[in-house]
Amino acid sequence: MLAGAAWRMGGFAFEEFAADKKTGKKRRPTFRGRVDLYLKVGRQQYIAEAKYCWSGATSVRPATTQNLTNRLQEAVEDIRIVPRNGQRKLGILFATPYIAKSRKARVDELLNTWIAAMTSVKCSCSAWVFPAESRYISGLAICPGAAVLIKEI
């Protein structure tokens, strides 16, 4: 999704590439690892680690926000150990809310409650898309769209 956005803006993206990461130990200060994403748009360069999570939206509680925060923080911690070579560092979380099929009549209400919980997560920016057409497509659950939360460090 982000790679495609970079390309559409005349930039480029490189996914899943090898890089040295810091261990924090003197004996072996680095190890060879993988970075999820490199983006260049205009003069700006970014490296990012991304995580994905399913997030229950049938019953939103304080734990919902905390779980999203924790998963975003995992991405932040992962990018923190990658040396900065002139790039800005991003922790990214892609989250998909799901709603029990039995709550189909309340999808809009439950989705709005989930969005309120998601937007209370401290991050640099967030975006979401929940097209009306997809709000009622269901398998085991209703998965009406997705959100992305980005935290720059």
Description of each model-found segment:
Residues 1-4:
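Conserved helicase motor "Helicase C" RecA-like lobe of SF1/SF2 P-loop NTPases
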Residues 6-30, 36-37:
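A short acidic/basic microdomain associated with nuclease active sites
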Residues 54-84:
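Mg2+/Mn2+-dependent nuclease catalytic core
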Residues 86-153:
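Glycine-rich, aromatic-bearing surface loops/beta-hairpins
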